Amino acid sequence: WPVGRIPDEKGKEAVFLLEQLRYLNNEYAVKVEAKSMRATSFLSSLLAGLAAFIQNRLRAVQKDVNLGCSAEVWKLPSSEVYAAIDKASALKLSPPTTPETLLDKQASKAKFAYFNLHGLKDAPEWYGQRDFRTQSRDPEYPIALTPSLFDNQNKAPELILSEACYGANILDKKADDAICMTFLATGTRAFVGSTCIAYGSVAKPLIAADLLAHDFWTHVQQGVSVGYALMRAKMTLARNMTANQGYLDGEDQKTILSFVLYGD
């Protein structure tokens, strides 16, 4: 079943958890009020229907702003994944992308964000990786993303999927020590990531976390809710790998088990 978790930071204080619950409560209250207004009168229903029609038309005309960043060495699979939500050519690579340049030309808060970067169990940053096939003099493992990049002025994307190892690891961490919790504290409504090592490929075809991410975004673009999109992506991964190789290997099993949803 689709399950979304509401994480909390370490310590005895519950401020981080309460802020998330308060935000969700407000969101639900707005939805309930909207439904109640639609049911009060014919005129209200008519106006609500007209507002929904206008909103849908505006969405059709206005293109959502999205964000994507991958380690340079994983450009090929990451580009195919990102193409599910935006132009593959818009995917940023690290190197050369750094925290100082990641949001360059980002006119507004991103709706969707996809990251395929390195993560460490005990480090708050995510890292890129130079493509070993190039002659570049860029750092081999540059910092690509830090928790301080997003705040109340620079809101985090609405929905994020990250393939970073330990991207969803929150054990014994404060909010500033885990990017996923920083995201949730600064505007992200749902975050999907791995609690441990994530597995992918440097080339095609897509496997493990790459395949999961591609199918997840495909379902989201079709209007499927985030929880069901993740559940269906896991089911598709299990079905395809079983059909292709007759079983689920260790990487497949860990991918299905380790990717979780935070938020709602």
Located regions from the model:
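Structural alpha-beta junctions
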Residues: W1, V61, Y82-P96, T182-S194, ...
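A short acidic, often aromatic-flanked loop/helix-cap motif at beta-alpha or helix-coil junctions
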Residues: E9-E13, T98-L102, Y199-G200
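Intrinsically disordered, low-complexity segments enriched in small/polar residues
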Residues: L21, N26, P139, Q245, ...
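Catalytic-core segments of thiol-dependent peptidases
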Residues: L46, L67-K173, D177
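Structured catalytic cores of large enzymes
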Residues: W1-K87
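Active-site-proximal C-terminal subdomain of hydrolase catalytic domains
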Residues: L159-D264
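A general structural signal for short secondary-structure junctions and capping/turn motifs
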Residues: R57-A60, L102-A107, L149-N154, C180-A185, ...
